[in-house]
């Protein structure tokens, strides 16, 4: 029979010291905490944590080793109207656990009770935590530390990126091992991206509703254990080290790794959801609750983590440090990041945001906010503090509207092209703060954006009610991928115009994986539950010419000084000149009155020509000898100081020097 010693209150979670394992769990309102350990026959032994330091319950188990499976039972009042939902009949996961054994299944036995305790024991069907050892040989690994103004982000899903790649060994496709395979590294470096932003790799659970439909949470935003590397994306049985191998391989190629992390809600969902972890450990501390103990739902996922509580702030900060120090990641993208600044109203001076900003162990990390949630005052674009960058939906929507609908002025276009200075040039923020994107995992792919006017999400099992209807897409005359050659050519021209705009805008460009390959999701703009060939990239059918075009754009971006400077463009600094199609400065009327033709002179030498009109037009070029710059088509060179721009066309010219 194992016996617990007193142990210590830090660090939280299960910590192996070479001789045994220390366990520490936060709970302010609990009256009794039991550590539950399980042998290979699933036999449970309960050990009471009698030592308590403040609100931390702790104990030390001598001779315990990595691989030990465990959980907790936490007892205390069950008073839902007071926010108290303790239930010792439910085996609970350690919120700081580094590994999960098993999977959270759809079973009513996991329900802790709505108005009264559910007394069915959940241990037999509940997944278990696993003690891990974190030693690893990083060799000479170094963070690439790519400067923000030199960063090009590539957003991808581990499985979606690698599952169908024919040159990756079949037994590792769709995994972290595939991500670090030389074939994938070579592809990313040849494309020219500098940072790989991964959809969640934190251990997640599939919602009961999806399990009932035979679907999975493909994206992974239903996070269960934020400290644990998701087992479902590992080729082998050691997800942590497999992930670290991939990070090390990417770093050797100079590619940063940014993780999409979820701290706004948990996998316990609403009051009818399962009791898996925080709800049973300390419901009042971990969640935002109403006056009668009801869950606030500013996330749309049933609950909201209370990120202004000191203990919850410490938990998040410990988690970020784990991924930074143990896994060597280079940055984080925070899902529904307004929640991080709620007190409950949003403030840029919120304690968690301040902790991230000032933590010495996170210095050099790239921090990216998705600056909204669905609560009151949830839209906070431009309001996050330095050093955060932010996903810009204004950039996405305005650029889509300019090219695909023609209802955005040149003034609005120019503001987005210039890193949305009207939004971000405040509070000492720099142009990199605008994460410019046309598409992302949620929404249409670029090919679908020019092929569908309406979403087609029936496969999600929600009657096509899910996903946004505000897409600003344009199918160019026919709904769906199949169309005549004229429509297909116009769609390709629109894709190239949008991609050129994205890559050559000031700010930080983010490219959705597959957009450079012509990937389609058949019009599904909310493919969160499609873990299949709908979302996986089809490498063998890829548009290689489009990929080469995008790689050329990224290379071109690197050669233009105006796009490599850290500071804002200023009038007269030589970085940018805005010209009409006659080659003259735009008049106030032209800025705001329906013009769709524009010349942008960058660094005095690169001339970006935009004809977003539905009609061809002549552009009078500034003085000098101009030639078409790669990767643009040299079959339409300027003649006699004039460029003949086709409808919905874009081109970059370079001024020849003597």
From Swiss-Prot:
It comes from Pectobacterium carotovorum subsp. carotovorum (strain PC1). Residues 457-468 have a biased composition (Basic and acidic residues). It catalyses: Hydrolysis of (1->6)-alpha-D-glucosidic linkages to branches with degrees of polymerization of three or four glucose residues in limit dextrin. Residues 457-478 are annotated as: Disordered. This is Glycogen debranching enzyme. InterPro entries: GlgX_C, GlgX_Isoamylase_N_E_set, Glyco_hydro_13_cat_dom, Glyco_hydro_13_N, Glyco_hydro_b, Glycogen_debranch_bac, Glycogen_debranch_GlgX, Glycoside_hydrolase_SF. It is an enzyme of class 3 (hydrolase). The record marks 442 as: Transition state stabilizer. Belongs to the glycosyl hydrolase 13 family. HAMAP family: GlgX (MF_01248). SMART domains: Aamy. Keywords: Carbohydrate metabolism, Glycogen metabolism, Glycosidase, Hydrolase. GO terms for biological process: glycogen catabolic process. Pfam families: Alpha-amylase, CBM_48, GlgX_C. The active site is at residues 335, 370. Pathway: Glycan degradation; glycogen degradation. One of its GO terms (molecular function) is hydrolase activity, hydrolyzing O-glycosyl compounds. It comes from the Bacteria. Its EC number is 3.2.1.196. Removes maltotriose and maltotetraose chains that are attached by 1,6-alpha-linkage to the limit dextrin main chain, generating a debranched limit dextrin.
